Amino acid sequence: MTVKIGINGFGRIGRNFLRAAMEQSADIEIVAVNDLTDNKTLAHLLKYDSVGGRLAADVSFDADSITVDGKAIKVFEERDPANLPWGDLGVDIVIESTGRFTKAVDAKKHIDGGAKKVIISAPGTDVDGTFVMGVNDGDYDNETMHIISNASCTTNCLAPLAQVFNDNFGIERGFMMTAHAYTADQNLQDGPHGDLHRARAAALNIVPASTGAAKAIGLVLPELQGKLSGSSYRVPIPTGSIVDLTIITPTDGLTVETINAAYEKAAAEGALVGYLKYNTDAIVSTDIVHDDHSSIFDAGQTNVSGNLVKVSAWYDNEWGYSNRLVDLAELVGDKL
């Protein structure tokens, strides 16, 4: 069954979701978009992307819609999701990608408007479930879960990294650090901002930032609840990020080779195939841009000092995450 999708918020993630659905040839029909920007701008930003390049499709617009390769996508400009006619359009799932309606009570407005399900493209509050594909997507229950979260891009990278290590060797405690590409909530030039770190020029500075990825790990891996904490630094690149996970393990005598072998196996067989990638090349952030894996394990960065271990994984924080949104939407749609 083709799943009918409405996108609320046609920014970086909303547009990349559409691109990813096209590239995957997913069994998805995007029937409507809601965004406060005019259609000319929305069409232009979909067609031309500074990171992803030009979309390999014909894109046009009129007063009511954007057309992609002959398929018209209805466009609305509503501030309140309660005013969106999802039911009239036959929308099955809303991708909530504004970043504003992350609480279940707010996202429920899409359900009230006729949508069957909502997937929030960010950590959610009081949602029915939080999912990382390949890690806990088997826990999705169509009967009881209607407003769910795709977690964060960093949690999507961290969860496979932590799961493989914990399953093979055990984690007593851990600390995650992510060097994360800058995002639109930072200033291009120094200027006022509610967060004084993010007030500084994004393209000129390494900027300390908050992250809830480590604390959120317990939502998808309950066995690690309370065992991880973390920090984040925004770095002056537009996309391409890395997670370093430092672990205290109860297992003695581990070697780099033993640890790497566990990740190589997990990437080649089992639930993480297609989500976890094993890499032995000497890569940098540019090399993983437009890689659709959630977590790209870098074997060359593994370090061991007794029971203290560091493992690392790269992720394209936009493209990889948007592909997981498509995967989760297909999973939810298949169970409708």
Give residue spans per PLM region.
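Structural beta-strand/beta-sheet cores of well-ordered domains, especially the beta-sheet scaffolds
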Residues: V3, A26, E172, S231-Y233, ...
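Generic secondary-structure signature for well-ordered alpha-helical cores
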Residues: M22-A26, Q163-I171, A181-A184, T211, ...
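Short clusters of hydrophobic/aromatic residues that line enzyme substrate/ligand-binding pockets
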Residues: I66, F131-M133, I147, Q189, ...
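Short, solvent-exposed beta-strand edge segments and adjacent coil->beta transition regions
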Residues: T144-M145, A201-A203, G240-D244, L308-K310
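Catalytic core of tubulin tyrosine ligase-like
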Residues: G170-S232, P238
